[in-house]
Structure formats: C-alpha cells, structure tokens
Amino acid sequence: MNEPYYSDDHVTIYHGDCLELLPEMSDVGLVLTSPPYNLNGDGNKTGGKGKSWAALGDGYPSHADDMPHADYVEWQRAVLGGLWDTLTDAGAIFYNHKPRVGGDRVRLPLELVPDYMPVRQVVIWDRGSGFNRNQTFYVPTHEWVLLIAKPAFRTNTRSVDDVWRIPFEKGGEHPAPFPLSLATRAIGTTDAALILDPFMGSGTTLRAAKDLGRKAIGIELSERYCEIAAQRCAQEVLAL
C-alpha cells in the first residue's frame, strides 16, 4: 500500500488511481462516491452544472470528461467491481450519477453497474434547480444515488424516504461537489464504521464521516484536491 498523503485518527487520504489502490483495501462498510460523469463524451448533451472537470477546475489537467462511451462504461464497471470486493458482508455502495442524453436517447447509470452487482434501490437526489441550453429535452434537476448492496446490508432507520431534496452547493473548491448534507444523510442512515470514497475530490465524504465519528478513506488522482481535502479534514469536529 502507498504511504498516505494525509492521515489522522479518523481520515486517511491516498493520492493515486483508485483502480491501483482498491485491491489493497478491505473491511469497508460503505462506499459513497460520485465519479466524473463523462458529460463531454460521445455527444452527451446533459444540461446543468455537470462534471466538466478540466474546464471548470485546473486540478484535472489530464481528464477532460470526454472518454468514448464504451471505454467509460468499461472503466466504471471495473471501478465498481473493485469497490464491491472491498465491502464487508453487510456493506453497500452509494453511487451518485445521473441520466445523460447522448444523441437521441437517455443513458441511464444502471448500464455502468456490472450484472452481478444487485442494485437494491434508486434514491432520487432532487437538487431543486438546473440549467439547460438544449430545447430537445426538459431541464434536468435531479440525480440518482444507486444503492448497490450486499444481502446483509441494512439501514438504521425506517423514516427516510427515497427522494432527497437537497440543494446543490455553489462556489466550492471542486468543480462538481455533492453537498455535505447529502453525504451526512447517506452515512448517518447506516451503521457503517469505515467509509470509502475512491473519487474523493475536495473531501466531502470524508468530512461528513469525521463529523459523524466514523473512519474514512479517500482516494484522489489530483494532488491539488488531496491538499484541499487534507486541510478540510484537519479541522476538528465542532461540538453541537
């Protein structure tokens, strides 16, 4: 295993490619992640802020979010397969993605999940607003959180529904973060002791895990965002 970029009592950050690092990891109770969406690849026309990482943030000079669609599907299936192998028998993956319009049809995130991995539920993240310059389809204002779960996985609540109305956050360090409150809800409604985010970005998953008293591992390809996440996670948990 590589030396951590940053580590404290709750959080460990690794700088590198998740496909290379995942085989060294195990005993993960929950994966919470949001990969690049490939919005510039093969004619995708999805509106909204999106995840055009190279255009919106200089932390990803080698990734323009424009892979050929078949290559992108193969990559994401490989990542999800590697994540599945890190889980405990009661573990689960919360995989944040979105429907994308490519050509004349919508591409659903379900195609990115290997056939042997059971998608138990689709949680709708209602962002409240969106943006679209294309009149061939309506303004997209929601994303998906796929719950991909081992048979023994259970939530710790019976009161949380499958539509999460959480406004997206603007003006952060990363071009496409999900809100801290979304990460807090996902982690807080499980009893997972160890959380993993293989596309860590600015460290939202890790910050939420630390605030909830859980341990977390983050993997990030960009050294710039490793540093941003490390500074964010180095802050002590505030007493409420």
Question: How would you label these PLM feature ranges?
Answer:
Residues 4-8, 230-240:
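Short, conserved SAM-binding/catalytic segment
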Residues 2-227:
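Core catalytic lobe of class I
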